[in-house]
């Protein structure tokens, strides 16, 4: 009986299990565009701020909405949210310098490209010429947070699904690439050193051994992040959707991808649900509710081992601290529709 009660509690239609899991360090909130990811991530951050010493909310979506949600301007540096002393927010600038990513091994005050020898400017140009620079910038911020450990828990308000999946792949891709570069450096290092002469320095005065060491340090840090992302005690992903075919299809695709990356996900927030009263004369409302119920039934059938949170379509926009706080309460206390 105790185990059955535990299962029932675990699968409660709330995000309370995330608040109760004190080991969590990384929480991703993602889904298709326009389903309420930002509102959900802001609301979850507000709830977490009641339980944790320090919370950081990061927007990795190029179309930043955190400033709009809180009615407060945020930028690339973490800033306290008005009315909170332990909740900060920031919006990563996708057009910012890729140097942040390459600087993860540099000392404070040091030119981030210095450790990369003559390849610094070349790598920067290359980075901006390839797709996925948004993901690279987001990941650079993750590396910074891993090194600083300034916040107890970090929530990511992610970009639409495709960007998010590329971002979550980024650590594995980077780790493999840097591992290969390190291997080649060790293999051809002696030959290169013989060309460089007795000083063993690159044309701009940097030492080849220092370059290899910095790349190895970066690879180790990325490996650490990769390990944390795949640890269910440290990382989880909250899927946000609406009860429509395309959103449900995108959610299923995302969950399959997350499973293939070994990233934990056990929570789904279904937004914009209609709850018309029984004798409601509105034909459109009743027809839409009927359609929503069909997809909601599919969600509950497909994800019977998930915490499925049902959120109502509200009359007003959820903007500003007060409305977000009110919305956030429904993430931990199931919404009861009026009869």
Swiss-Prot record:
<keyword id="KW-0547">Nucleotide-binding</keyword>
<keyword id="KW-0963">Cytoplasm</keyword>
<feature type="binding site">
    <location>
        <position position="244"/>
    </location>
    <ligand>
        <name>ATP</name>
    </ligand>
</feature>
<dbReference type="InterPro" id="IPR016300">
    <property type="entry name" value="ATPase_ArsA/GET3"/>
</dbReference>
<dbReference type="GO" id="GO:0005085">
    <property type="term" value="F:guanyl-nucleotide exchange factor activity"/>
</dbReference>
<feature type="binding site">
    <location>
        <position position="271"/>
    </location>
    <ligand>
        <name>ATP</name>
    </ligand>
</feature>
<dbReference type="InterPro" id="IPR027542">
    <property type="entry name" value="ATPase_ArsA/GET3_euk"/>
</dbReference>
<feature type="active site">
    <location>
        <position position="61"/>
    </location>
</feature>
<dbReference type="InterPro" id="IPR025723">
    <property type="entry name" value="Anion-transp_ATPase-like_dom"/>
</dbReference>
<dbReference type="GO" id="GO:0051082">
    <property type="term" value="F:unfolded protein binding"/>
</dbReference>
<dbReference type="GO" id="GO:0010038">
    <property type="term" value="P:response to metal ion"/>
</dbReference>
<dbReference type="GO" id="GO:0005524">
    <property type="term" value="F:ATP binding"/>
</dbReference>
<dbReference type="GO" id="GO:0009408">
    <property type="term" value="P:response to heat"/>
</dbReference>
<dbReference type="GO" id="GO:0000750">
    <property type="term" value="P:pheromone-dependent signal transduction involved in conjugation with cellular fusion"/>
</dbReference>
<comment type="similarity">
    <text>Belongs to the arsA ATPase family.</text>
</comment>
<feature type="binding site">
    <location>
        <position position="285"/>
    </location>
    <ligand>
        <name>Zn(2+)</name>
    </ligand>
</feature>
<dbReference type="GO" id="GO:0042802">
    <property type="term" value="F:identical protein binding"/>
</dbReference>
<keyword id="KW-0378">Hydrolase</keyword>
<protein>
    <recommendedName>
        <fullName>ATPase get3</fullName>
        <ecNumber>3.6.-.-</ecNumber>
    </recommendedName>
</protein>
<dbReference type="InterPro" id="IPR027417">
    <property type="entry name" value="P-loop_NTPase"/>
</dbReference>
<comment type="function">
    <text>ATPase required for the post-translational delivery of tail-anchored (TA) proteins to the endoplasmic reticulum. Recognizes and selectively binds the transmembrane domain of TA proteins in the cytosol. This complex then targets to the endoplasmic reticulum by membrane-bound receptors, where the tail-anchored protein is released for insertion. This process is regulated by ATP binding and hydrolysis. ATP binding drives the homodimer towards the closed dimer state, facilitating recognition of newly synthesized TA membrane proteins. ATP hydrolysis is required for insertion.</text>
</comment>
<feature type="binding site">
    <location>
        <position position="282"/>
    </location>
    <ligand>
        <name>Zn(2+)</name>
    </ligand>
</feature>
<keyword id="KW-0256">Endoplasmic reticulum</keyword>
<dbReference type="GO" id="GO:0071816">
    <property type="term" value="P:tail-anchored membrane protein insertion into ER membrane"/>
</dbReference>
<dbReference type="GO" id="GO:0006620">
    <property type="term" value="P:post-translational protein targeting to endoplasmic reticulum membrane"/>
</dbReference>
<dbReference type="GO" id="GO:0016887">
    <property type="term" value="F:ATP hydrolysis activity"/>
</dbReference>
<keyword id="KW-0813">Transport</keyword>
<dbReference type="GO" id="GO:0043529">
    <property type="term" value="C:GET complex"/>
</dbReference>
<dbReference type="GO" id="GO:0006890">
    <property type="term" value="P:retrograde vesicle-mediated transport, Golgi to endoplasmic reticulum"/>
</dbReference>
<comment type="subunit">
    <text>Homodimer.</text>
</comment>
<keyword id="KW-0067">ATP-binding</keyword>
<dbReference type="GO" id="GO:0044183">
    <property type="term" value="F:protein folding chaperone"/>
</dbReference>
<dbReference type="GO" id="GO:0034599">
    <property type="term" value="P:cellular response to oxidative stress"/>
</dbReference>
<keyword id="KW-0479">Metal-binding</keyword>
<feature type="binding site">
    <location>
        <begin position="32"/>
        <end position="39"/>
    </location>
    <ligand>
        <name>ATP</name>
    </ligand>
</feature>
<dbReference type="Pfam" id="PF02374">
    <property type="entry name" value="ArsA_ATPase"/>
</dbReference>
<keyword id="KW-0862">Zinc</keyword>
<dbReference type="GO" id="GO:0046872">
    <property type="term" value="F:metal ion binding"/>
</dbReference>
